[in-house]
C-alpha cells in the first residue's frame, strides 16, 4: 500500500531536479580525469576525490569568467559572448597569464577554422572567372539561340550561288524557246498577186 503523501512526492521531485541542475553545473568528470592524466606521468594515479575536487574547481572557474564576460556584453547591449570578451574578462579578473596564452590559441583556432571553411566551400577569386549564376545564364542564352535558328541553315554564299544558277537557267530556257520556234525567229511573209495576173495564169493552164 502506497503511504507516500502528495507533499512527499513533490519534495522528492524537487530534490531530483536539484540534483540534475547540480550535475549540469559541473563538467563531465571523465573529461576532467582524462585531462589530468594527460598532464601527469603514465605511472601516476589520480584518486576519486582529487577528480571531484578538480571538477568543481574547473567548473567554478568557467562560471566565474563567463559571468564577467556576460556583464560586459550586457553593458555593451550585446547578446553574444565572443572570444575577445573572455580575454578581457581574464585580464579584469587578474588572470593575465592565462589571457596571453588563450589569445594565441584563439588566433590559431580562427585560422584553422578559416582554412577548414575554404576547403569545404571553395570560391573562385580569380579575375575573369565565371560564377555559377553567370554560367547558368550563358547556357540558357545558348540554348535559346539554338532553338531560334533553323535546323539546316543555308549559308549566304550558297544562297547567292543558287539564285545565280536559277537566273542563268531561266535565261537558257528562254533562249532555247526562241531558237526552236521558227515563227518567232522568222516571221512569215505572204505576197498576194494582182487579180488580173491570177486570171491570166488560169487561162494559160
Swiss-Prot record:
Residues 133-145 have a biased composition (Basic and acidic residues). Keywords: Activator, DNA-binding, Nucleus, Transcription, Transcription regulation. PANTHER family: CCAAT-BINDING TRANSCRIPTION FACTOR-RELATED, NUCLEAR TRANSCRIPTION FACTOR Y SUBUNIT BETA. It is found in: Nucleus. This is Transcriptional activator HAP3. GO terms for molecular function: DNA-binding transcription activator activity, RNA polymerase II-specific; protein heterodimerization activity; RNA polymerase II cis-regulatory region sequence-specific DNA binding. Residues 27-33 bind DNA. Residues 154-170 have a biased composition (Low complexity). Two complexes bind CCAAT; complex I, that consists of HAP2/3/5 and complex II, that consists of HAP2/3/5/4. Transmembrane segments: none annotated.
